[in-house]
Amino acid sequence: LARMINGEGWLGTKKQCKLTIIPCENYTHATRYRLPIAPSPNLPNMQSVYLYPAICLFEGTCVSLGRGTSLPFQQYGHPQMVGYSHSFTPRSVPGAKHPPLENERCWGIDLSQLPEDSVQKAGFDLSYVINAYRNLNRGDAFFTPFFEKLVGVDYVRTMIEEGCSAAEIKAMWHDDVERFKQQRRPYLLYPNS
């Protein structure tokens, strides 16, 4: 990204990031890498890292994403979600002081045992947020203003409220993603596989 920032002149006239790049040998975008150290107490394993892009959207809703439990970013729930046998209770712990819905039993979904390949293939999966939104039936009260900052656009909330599917929402940004992929091509360090 820093090479692209320089190449596209995004910092303004005559400003450049000072870069030193040491490429990895035998690496491609398909290479699996296991983090030797958890990047955060709330991302304790690779499953949480792979689920993060989708589950972090709950930070902009009334739903818990499991902070203050043994499965942060690997489960989600709310005290009023119905139809689920999985439950968890967020507690104040190191790395998650006073998490949302602290000391409240939340009902929801455990994603910790999903096959890693399916999580990676799904990528930025909006179905979890859509599922919770429909289950809680709270309308606009489901979301906080932070949701738009997380998702990056203002139409996702509206489309969820209108009953659109994850595929319909993703179709809205498909062309933008393809344009970005073309724009970034000259700056890639590793082959796209």
Task: Walk through the language-model features, giving the residues of each.
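Extracytoplasmic
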Residues: 14-16, 70, 106
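C-terminal regions of mature proteins
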Residues: 164-193
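Active-site-lining helix/loop region of Rossmann-like oxidoreductase modules
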Residues: 33-86
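Generic structural "secondary-structure junction" signal
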Residues: 24, 57-60, 65-67, 77-78, ...
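Conserved anion/nucleotide-ligand pocket segment
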Residues: 1-55
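Intrinsically disordered, low-complexity boundary segments flanking structured domains
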Residues: 4-11, 59-63, 75, 93-100
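Conserved functional hotspot residues or short segments at active or partner-binding sites
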Residues: 72, 76-174
